[in-house]
């Protein structure tokens, strides 16, 4: 077990609190380490492994959490039956408690979207671009809407329109003036997909909906939730309904799964339970120059006062100040020229190119 003095006062406060805790883990502050420590602490307090549920978003995150928990249990010399560990993704947790053997591939949804777009001539693109770009992005939109529990039988026009508008802000797939028309396409495609699905099986969003409909859902003493910023409304309801006490870790600034319904608004479902709120500020990954620059940048781009406060006091574990980052405003051709010049000077795997949308990747490539 890590010594108390090595954990830090912020983490220790979160670990020692007996009730529900909501941790804002800024990048590089060791959230997986903290979750694993919380698990070990609960076991040391006499909580049985079968009474603790751990939920995360991706299979990779699940494997990492499982690995960290096992390592720290061994380090703490805790004799625990590892077969009793309950570490799941949200979908694997739902599947484990449902008798749903016929899970369909996402390819069916893509096929239905493609056939509809071709038949109705919605876009004037060739097949290659439809298949590689438009269809996957429309699939993301469908998954996003369904993650809010929207189905053809439960279509709320106003709610669906509002969600489409929110999605449009982070995607250039839909022009504002086309939202009404697109809503009609969505309802038609959704209906066709549900009919096809009824013949072939259920999809992953159905797993969550069907799990929530169970009368006798499994109950635990504690639920540990990772990557809270990426949790959608259905997943938030599953986590909060699984135990009275939660230990949730996330960072609104790192929300990346908005297309699947992940929303910083779902933080509110957890804050309504009046947990202890703890902010982690000690960064073990970045230099102080990068932290100062990032804090200043994020503060200039957000109007949410609580999010701004989360950036106060970011401190590097590394004593080296490092090099101050620079922002250069330039046109596309100038940026491409700069990238090409850099590639000739350094190894290509030392350079990262990050853009806002998939269409921008196509332009740069």
Give residue ranges: language-model regions.
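Conserved phosphoryl-transfer catalytic core
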Residues: 80, 113, 120, 245-261, ...
């Amino acid at each position: 077990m890590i010594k108390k003095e090595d954990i830090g006062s912020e983490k220790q406060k979160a670990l020692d609190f007996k009730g529900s805790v909501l941790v804002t883990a800024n990048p590089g502050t060791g959230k997986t380490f903290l979750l694993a420590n919380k698990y070990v602490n609960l076991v040391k307090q006499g909580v049985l492994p079968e009474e603790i549920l751990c939920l995360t978003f991706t299979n990779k995150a699940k494997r990492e959490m499982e690995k960290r928990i096992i390592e720290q249990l061994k380090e703490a010399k805790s004799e625990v039956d590892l077969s009793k560990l309950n570490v799941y993704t949200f979908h694997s947790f739902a599947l484990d408690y449902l008798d749903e053997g016929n899970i369909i591939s996402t390819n069916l949804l893509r096929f239905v979207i493609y056939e509809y777009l071709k038949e109705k001539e919605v876009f004037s693109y060739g097949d290659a671009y439809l298949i590689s770009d438009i269809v996957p992005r429309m699939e993301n939109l469908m998954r996003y809407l369904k993650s809010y529990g929207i189905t053809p039988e439960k279509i709320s026009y106003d709610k669906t329109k509002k969600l489409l508008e929110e999605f449009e802000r982070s995607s250039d797939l839909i022009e504002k003036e086309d939202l009404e028309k697109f809503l009609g396409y969505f309802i038609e495609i959704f209906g066709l997909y549900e009919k096809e699905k009824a013949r072939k099986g259920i999809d992953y969003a159905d797993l969550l909906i069907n799990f929530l409909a169970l009368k006798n859902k499994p109950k635990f003493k504690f639920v540990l939730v990772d990557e809270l910023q990426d949790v959608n409304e259905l997943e938030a309801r599953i986590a909060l309904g699984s135990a009275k006490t939660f230990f949730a870790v996330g960072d609104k600034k790192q929300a990346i799964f908005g297309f699947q319904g992940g929303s910083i608004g779902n933080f509110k479902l957890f804050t309504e339970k009046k947990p202890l709120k703890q902010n982690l500020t000690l960064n073990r990954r970045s230099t102080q120059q990068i932290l100062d620059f990032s804090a200043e940048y994020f503060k200039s781009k957000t109007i949410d006062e609580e999010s701004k406060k989360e950036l106060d006091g970011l401190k590097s574990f590394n004593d080296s100040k490092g090099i101050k980052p620079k922002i250069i405003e330039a046109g596309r051709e100038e940026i491409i020229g700069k990238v090409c010049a850099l590639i000739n000077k350094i190894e290509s795997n030392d350079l990262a190119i990050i853009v806002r949308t998939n269409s921008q990747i196509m332009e740069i490539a």
